[in-house]
């Protein structure tokens, strides 16, 4: 049985691609969005729930909107934002935004496990990043300098907290660590250990490839309770 997906971050760059990929593969999808969004597709397998991803009550509402009897996988593609793509651009999201959402997801998951009715959650799949945890040591010197001297440090700090929160939670997880993102077409990915040992000097992966991998991680058990680094 295909798991159904609760998608958090469906209106973002990667989230939109995850949504399209999941629907194409036949998954039932519930998207938690902050406000009604006309950019989401009209699809028989898509349910939209309005709410705050950092509010456990709203996340619980979304989980209880899923179809009973079908296991749920939660995918989060939330990310820190800045006023532009420049690493030194001012942050436009709260400093601990992603970690607040991870905590809300875990709290809501505990609530729905108690029922009634009971919602079966198989795992939590999070789009993390290359540089978190033990992968930081394998960033090249240019990337390490950028993380240490630009506003990307807020993103790394938040993702590091998410990593810790999810590992300390009660759900099985996959913490996917994509390398440098680009807009190329989807291509096969190479999966590295969490440390990213063996990646090239300036590794790249397309956003489309990441979206496909996140949906793969939702439906397969190959990477459960790990933090795979992925690159094309």
Residue ranges and their predicted role:
Residues 2-28:
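N-terminal Rossmann NAD(P)H-binding glycine-rich loop of SDR-like oxidoreductase domains
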Residues 1-6, 20, 39-42, 231-232:
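Eukaryotic N-terminal targeting leaders
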């Amino acid at each position: 049985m295909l798991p159904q997906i609760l998608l958090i971050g469906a209106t973002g760059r990667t989230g939109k691609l995850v949504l399209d990929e999941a629907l194409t593969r036949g998954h039932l999808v519930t998207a938690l969005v902050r406000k009604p969004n006309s950019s989401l597709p009209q699809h028989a397998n898509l349910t939209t729930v309005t709410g705050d991803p950092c509010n456990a009550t709203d996340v619980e509402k979304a989980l209880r909107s899923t179809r009973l009897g079908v296991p749920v996988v939660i995918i989060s593609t939330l990310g820190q934002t800045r006023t532009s793509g420049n690493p030194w651009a001012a942050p436009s999201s709260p400093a601990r935004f992603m970690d607040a959402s991870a905590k809300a997801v875990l709290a809501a998951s505990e609530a729905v496990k108690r029922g009634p009715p009971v919602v079966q959650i198989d795992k939590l799949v999070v789009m993390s990043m290359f540089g978190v945890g033990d992968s930081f040591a394998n960033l090249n010197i240019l990337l390490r300098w950028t993380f240490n001297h630009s506003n990307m440090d807020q993103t790394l700090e938040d993702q590091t907290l998410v990593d810790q929160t999810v590992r300390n939670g009660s759900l099985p997880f996959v913490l996917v660590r994509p390398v440098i993102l680009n807009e190329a077409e989807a291509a096969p990915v190479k999966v590295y250990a969490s440390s990213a040992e063996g990646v090239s000097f300036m590794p790249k992966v397309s956003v489309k490839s990441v979206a496909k991998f996140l949906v793969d991680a939702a439906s397969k058990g190959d990477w459960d309770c790990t933090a795979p680094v992925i690159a094309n």
